[in-house]
Amino acid sequence: MSAKNNIQDQLLNTARKEKIDLTIYLLNGVPLKGKVVSFDNFTIILENENKQNLVYKHAISTIIPAKPIKLHSEETPKEAGGV
């Protein structure tokens, strides 16, 4: 999958650049709130009240932004190779 089609990276990068608050739910149900400081292939650094959390992506269930995030290249299912 090319970088422009990587929805995960697009969402996290837009949230970081626009300083959008996120609620990240872990697999055990614990919610973490904050802004994305940085991320890589395996982790996200989330900051809230001047405290940083290093969150491993494999522990994440759901990411909910405080407002809708427009992805750069939203495609219709047909354009994406769907039916």
UniProtKB/Swiss-Prot annotation:
Sm domain segment(s): 9-69
GO terms classed as biological process: regulation of DNA-templated transcription; regulation of RNA stability; regulation of translation, ncRNA-mediated
Cellular component, GO annotation: cytosol
This protein's record includes keyword RNA-binding: yes
UniProt similarity note: Belongs to the Hfq family.
Known function: RNA chaperone that binds small regulatory RNA (sRNAs) and mRNAs to facilitate mRNA translational regulation in response to envelope stress, environmental stress and changes in metabolite concentrations. Also binds with high specificity to tRNAs.
SUBUNIT field: Homohexamer.
Name this protein carries in UniProt: RNA-binding protein Hfq
